[in-house]
């Protein structure tokens, strides 16, 4: 994923920062505990496609 894109992307819900989890292929919002998928190097920033992080899962 492009580093410049990562710098400008924010969570579409809370506008907070995102952390790229390359091994999982996800952008994670720690504030909302949501993980947005990255498909073919394209982030899918739709709330309906995000998954909630489990209580024991590290954000």
Swiss-Prot record:
<protein>
    <recommendedName>
        <fullName>UPF0434 protein LHK_01103</fullName>
    </recommendedName>
</protein>
<comment type="similarity">
    <text>Belongs to the UPF0434 family.</text>
</comment>
<dbReference type="InterPro" id="IPR005651">
    <property type="entry name" value="Trm112-like"/>
</dbReference>
<dbReference type="GO" id="GO:0005829">
    <property type="term" value="C:cytosol"/>
</dbReference>
<dbReference type="Pfam" id="PF03966">
    <property type="entry name" value="Trm112p"/>
</dbReference>
